[in-house]
Regions:
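A structural signal for multi-pass alpha-helical bundles of membrane permease subunits
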Residues: 2-243
Length: 243
């Protein structure tokens, strides 16, 4: 009976694995097809005549590599800024009790609920005055606004699991409050910081509206904007998108 249950579990897990992997397999298979093969009926699992023409087109005939590097720079900058701001903010909420703390936390939560579209005009005017439109830092700053509220809440939960006695012991040994944060809290909370950084990086990488609004040339356009350019009013270049 136990062996039957174990075999059934393996069958179910294998089936789930196939279901999860199949979209990636299909994407790779379609990337090696010619455009006229993509919409054939019935569909084929493997390309009839594999070709790398889509990859050559994307890598050497478009600005996708530049958009990719822009995304890496912007997402990395936004993530670093987010973590640098979120750690002290989360520490303050997790360790100190002061008047209005709960109100501030509610305001942070509400900031996460504000629709992006409603912030476009004031942000555009502010960024225009600062002359950071169509720059890596400008778009990274707008991404920071998207990811910071939830990052603070995430890190607050991780920091609250650390016993305050560790910091007290460090300060007895001569550490200042700031040194205790960077020598005790940050190393102990490294897994939580890494998880928060991954969340922030993914939010920045996938963000579309701010990147489209505040980038006016290829100098700061991200990969999400680059992929959108393969889709026009009359045609969608699926081969290039999948490549």
């Amino acid at each position: 009976m136990k062996k039957l249950k174990k075999d059934m579990l393996y069958v179910i897990l294998t089936a789930l694995g196939i279901v999860m992997i199949f979209p990636f397999f299909w994407m790779i298979s379609c990337a090696f097809r010619r455009p006229n093969e993509l919409l054939t009926s019935p569909p084929r699992l493997l390309p009839a005549s594999p070709t790398v023409s889509s990859f050559i087109h994307v890598l050497f005939e478009t600005e996708v590599p530049r958009y990719f590097m822009n995304s890496v720079i912007i997402a990395t900058t936004a993530t670093v800024l987010c973590i640098c701001v979120a750690i002290p903010a989360a520490y303050s909420f997790a360790r100190h009790n002061y008047r209005g703390k709960n109100l501030v936390m509610v305001c942070i939560l509400l900031c996460n609920m504000i629709p992006q579209a409603s912030t476009l005009v004031p942000l555009y005017r502010a960024m225009d005055r600062l002359q950071i439109i169509d720059t890596h830092f400008g778009i990274a700053f707008t991404h920071l606004l998207c990811m910071l509220p939830f990052s603070i809440i995430m890190l607050k939960g991780f920091i609250r699991t650390i016993p305050p006695t560790l910091e007290e012991a460090a300060m007895i040994d001569g550490c200042t409050k700031l040194q205790a944060i960077f020598k005790i809290i940050v190393p102990v909370c490294s897994s939580g910081i890494f998880a928060t950084a991954m969340y922030a990086f993914m939010i920045s990488w996938e963000e579309f509206l701010y990147a489209m609004t505040f980038s006016t040339s290829s100098r700061a356009r991200t990969i999400s904007i680059g992929l959108k350019m393969f889709s026009t009013e009359f045609k969608v270049d699926w081969s290039s998108i999948l490549a």
